[in-house]
UniProtKB/Swiss-Prot annotation:
This is Alpha-elapitoxin-Al2b. It is found in: Secreted. Residues 1-21 form the signal peptide. Keywords: Acetylcholine receptor inhibiting toxin, Disulfide bond, Ion channel impairing toxin, Neurotoxin, Postsynaptic neurotoxin, Secreted, Signal, Toxin. It comes from the Eukaryota.
Amino acid sequence: MKTLLLTLVVVTIVCLDFGGGLICYMGPKTPRTCPPGQNLCYTKTWCDGFCGSRGKVVVLGCAATCPTVKPGVDITCCATDKCNPFPKTKAPWERP
């Protein structure tokens, strides 16, 4: 029984330490492994001067903590692999 428990503990430690890190999108089709200590993926969107013609600016990445929310900026954070895909949006001229 002790051997089984010890084996489970060792396997758990190995899986946690060498899991390879969280995978987040950094661009529309660019997943990357986050650096150690950065255990969240985020999606940040906002309108700039070209929002009417190009749509919102989108920034994707990894973070240790969810970025601070600022007025006019939408931020979502998540903690599973590839949980921050590039938002599917229509071009402004395709909107009803």
